[in-house]
Structures are given as C-alpha cells and as structure tokens.
Amino acid sequence: MNHAIEAAYEKQMEEVVFNGDETRWFVIEQIDGKTGHRWYLWVFRSVSVIFYLMAPTRGADVPKIHFAGIKSLEIVVVCDRYTAYKSLASANEEITLAFCWAYMRRDFLDTARSYPEFEEWTFGWIEMIR
C-alpha cells in the first residue's frame, strides 16, 4: 500500500459509521489466477474516506479484510442484506449492521400487499422512512 492510501485507510478505521456495497465489474484483461472476467467492485465509505476495492470474489473475506483494522469499539455498517456483511458482523461483535432503508421500505410494502389489515400501519412507517 502506498503512503497516501495507507493514511486514508488508517483515518477510515478511526471512524464509526460506514456504508458498504459491492457490484459486478467486468474486467477485459486476463489476470493470472482468475478465470473469467467477472470481478467485483466493493465500496466502503465513511464520513471522510471512500475506498474502492477490486476483488476477484464477492466473498465475505473482502469486508473482513477491509475492516480488520477498525479501532473503535462500536461501529455501524449500513449495507444491504448480503451474507458477506452478516458474516462480517458475526465475526466482529463491535460491528452492528444497519440495513438499507430501501430494503426496509420494500419489506413494509410487501407487508401492506400481503396483509391489508396492516396497510395503514405499514404506510405510516413508510412515511417515517422518507
């Protein structure tokens, strides 16, 4: 790691609220040890630092390695419900997951559709999410 990246990483690991996400990323170039062109772009954002990581996998090791340097006793990672983040939190008691509001909103909408008797209640919560 170069000095600027290392300093940014150290700064990020001192913070307490993060956003995490990942998406497929197609790499055209052949890379030793990787079959196929599907890689993953991971993003870990805190208040002052945004890290973009390219990884050949979408596995739980990527966030576990990234957050290995956390310094705070309690942090929150806002993310989707992907199992890699659940695995991260299971392995680190200082990490609390806060699932993305968009996913929570979908759950409320599904409840309203499936249980009309709870429609008023669910739409009340949806209004608070906005």
Task: Walk through the language-model features, giving the residues of each.
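Catalytic center-proximal scaffold of phosphoryl-transfer enzymes
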Residues: 1-130
